[in-house]
Amino acid sequence: MYSLNIEAQDLSDYKWKNRIVIFYETENNIAEVKSALEINESNASKINERDIIVFTYKDSVLYTTEGKATEIKKSSTLPKSFNGYILIGKDGGIKAKSPYPFKIQQLTDLIDSMPMRRSEMKSNK
């Protein structure tokens, strides 16, 4: 469903190519993360259209949406723990830290309001 560059060794390898959403999972929010992943799956066209790659962060490891552990190193600028999700823009900067529950419309509206995304939408017409 999501394209994933398995050659990446660091989140910065996605810079200028993809936006990244990281869902932080702890023993206290498993249901929220599961719900968020299901929402993403049912909105795959919205996710893909915006060049979003989704990861889950659990026990200091980034996992793909298929649940496979990656060797990708998490940026030191990201929090070690968080009860929510983080959006990283194509420029590599943190664009949002939002608590659960995850709302796809909130995410897509935020992305669509960004200058880079507006430029992408104009060039895709």
Regions flagged by a language model, labelled:
Residues 2-125:
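Non-catalytic interaction/Regulatory regions outside core domains
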